[in-house]
Amino acid sequence: ILELEARGLEALEPFYQWVLELPADEVRRTLAAAAPSIKYHKQPALLEMARLARAYPGDSGAFAPLLLNLVYLNPGESLFLPARTPHAYLRGTGVEVMACSDNVLRAGLTDKHVDKPELLATVEFAIMYPQVLRPDYVGIEQEIPIPVADFRLSFLRPDGQHPFSVGGQGEIELLYGLCGQMTPTAADGETWSVGAAD
């Protein structure tokens, strides 16, 4: 870690490769040895690392808080991450939206396969400070200002008083209920129910 701090960005890729290739027993030993220091310093990244080590014993993904930005989002806030950017959701409820893709790579904190060579070849090793996006409010719609044209994301908070029209020619719309219930009506009069359980 001292080398990473001293060399900066040029040390990031070799450090990440070293972490990714650590055997599970070495991950456990390293994190166990760091435990007293973590309790003493109480740094957010170290505390998250300790929590992940307990939840995913032997998984090198537990080191992620040392390599990634810890970002805390309030309800309604969002992040936009470009392709090739590693990320993880540590707690809470989130909705992930991405453009059409069949190349999702896992980096850890999972029982699923981690394709380490492909991951190392694909990840963008760069210093990044993610910007928290806050919605633009227009009536019952909260639109997230996403900096790409591939898709858009907005949250609707129906109040029963204001009808809302969505869609346009050639657009695909997905409605996902996070809480409550709403009844959309199509142009032809067909209705259906969308709620948190649907």
Question: Which stretches of residues belong to each language-model region?
Answer:
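C-terminal structured domains
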Residues: 141-151
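Short, glycine-/Ser/Thr-/acidic-enriched flexible segments
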Residues: 78, 86, 94-95, 102-104, ...
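Long, charge-rich alpha-helical interaction segments
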Residues: 1-55
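Short acidic-glycine-tyrosine-enriched beta hairpin
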Residues: 68-80, 85-88, 95, 156, ...
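Glycine- and acidic-residue-biased ligand/ion/polar-headgroup-sensing regions
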Residues: 40-42, 46-50, 54-60, 90-93, ...
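Positively charged, Gly/Ser-enriched RNA/tRNA-binding surfaces
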Residues: 42-47, 53-85
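Conserved short histidine dyad/triad with adjacent acidic residue
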Residues: 139, 152-169, 195-196
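C-terminal, non-catalytic macromolecule-binding modules
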Residues: 93-143
